[in-house]
Amino acid sequence: MIELKNVTFGYPGTMRDIYEDFSISLSENKIYGLLGKNGMGKSTLLYLICGLLRASSGKITVDGYDAQLRRPEMLREIMIVPEEFELPKVTLDEYVMINAPFYPRFSKDVLVNCLQNFELPLSLRLDQLSMGQKKKVYMSFALAA
């Protein structure tokens, strides 16, 4: 369950808050969509839920964990694929060897299956991919984690 209670957030230097006294409860085992125009706060909401941004007031919990604390127990349950990011200059196989231990439920079988669907080999170098391919790799890793 993801809960936001009376959350207020605005970026420093802006005149108004993006979220003001915002509350919502998202139940488990349901699929939700997040729709809106560019610049309306969709990514901001996801970053708040992941604890990557801090609300100026209110409380955000993921499965009962305070999102701002970014506890490992919470991070096992949630992953965000950011719009812009850099991947290291390693092969995907090396990336998996480095990062998979942080995700106890990581499944290499799931990763390989996702990559096959995207027609991407495990031996590819991450720094040589297009942004679209990098996002596919990141999403595959997220699903496997």
Q: Could you say what each language-model-derived stretch is?
A:
Residues 32-37:
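The feature captures the beta-strand-to-loop junction immediately N-terminal to the Walker
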Residues 143-144:
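ABC ATPase C-loop
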Residues 58-66, 73-74:
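Conserved ABC transporter NBD signature motif
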Residues 50:
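Helix-to-loop junction immediately C-terminal to a conserved catalytic motif
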Residues 1-21, 28:
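A short, flexible loop at the N-terminus of ABC-type nucleotide-binding domains that lies
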Residues 80-138:
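ABC-family P-loop ATPase nucleotide-binding domains
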Residues 42:
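Conserved lysine of the Walker
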